């Protein structure tokens, strides 16, 4: 049997508990609906994260292969010089948006893709393979930023799902059962009190009648 609430067995408390149970059940349904919607949203974004992760792995393999070819083409020393002369790329701004009421990151950034001139290294000392390697790594950066946003969103959704699940379970297995058990107890106690009063009145009536008869 569920633990009882510490309340007085009165009709006022009985009515109050019944109202609280109605509200708790409505709250439970709303939270359960929210939990189900969060889980659906989580798996939708999870599928996107898997796709992005797979695409990122492929792009990284392509980028490192392109880098190896570029290094063979211009030499290791020249490759280091080129990498040190590259200008800083785009700035990344992290904002917030809401997904099912959960604040999640929104990363705003222009594409990292640039022309050879924008990168800052001298075109004459470079090569087409160096440009291709740079382009491939810029594609990697674009995907990495998107994946970071998606994976952080998943973490926050997972946390909210866990919090919502605990609330649903608390209502379903602890709070509502306690209130229902207390309602049952109060009803039983009120019935007992009513029967006791009934028998007490009968005894009083019998005593009065006995005295009247004598």
From Swiss-Prot:
Pfam families: ATP-synt_D (PF01813)
Record keywords: ATP synthesis, Cell membrane, Hydrogen ion transport, Ion transport, Membrane, Transport
Main location: membrane
GO biological process, one term: proton motive force-driven plasma membrane ATP synthesis
Superkingdom of source: Archaea
Any single Gene Ontology cellular-component annotation: plasma membrane
Function: Component of the A-type ATP synthase that produces ATP from ADP in the presence of a proton gradient across the membrane.
Family membership: Belongs to the V-ATPase D subunit family.
HAMAP family reported for this sequence: ATP_synth_D_arch
Oligomeric form and interacting partners: Has multiple subunits with at least A(3), B(3), C, D, E, F, H, I and proteolipid K(x).
Protein name per UniProt: A-type ATP synthase subunit D
């Amino acid at each position: 049997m569920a633990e009882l609430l510490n309340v007085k067995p009165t009709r006022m408390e009985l009515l109050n508990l019944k109202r609280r149970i109605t509200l708790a059940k409505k709250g439970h349904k709303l939270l359960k609906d929210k939990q189900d919607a969060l889980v659906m949203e989580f798996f939708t974004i999870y599928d996107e994260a898997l796709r992005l992760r797979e695409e990122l792995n492929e792009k990284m393999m392509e980028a490192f292969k392109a880098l190896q070819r570029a290094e063979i083409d211009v030499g290791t020393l020249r490759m280091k010089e080129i990498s040190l002369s590259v200008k800083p790329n785009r700035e990344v701004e992290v904002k917030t948006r809401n997904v099912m009421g959960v604040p999640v990151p929104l990363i705003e950034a222009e594409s990292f893709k640039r022309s050879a001139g924008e990168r800052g290294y001298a075109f004459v000392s470079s090569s087409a393979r160096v440009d291709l390697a740079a382009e491939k790594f810029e594609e990697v950066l674009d995907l990495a930023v998107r994946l970071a946003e998606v994976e952080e969103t998943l973490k926050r959704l997972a946390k909210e799902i866990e919090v919502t699940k605990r609330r649903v379970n608390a209502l379903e297995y602890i709070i509502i059962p306690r209130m229902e058990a207390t309602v049952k107890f109060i009803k039983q106690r009120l019935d007992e009190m009513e029967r006791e009063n009934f028998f007490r009145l009968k005894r009083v009536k019998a005593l009065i009648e006995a005295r009247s008869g004598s």
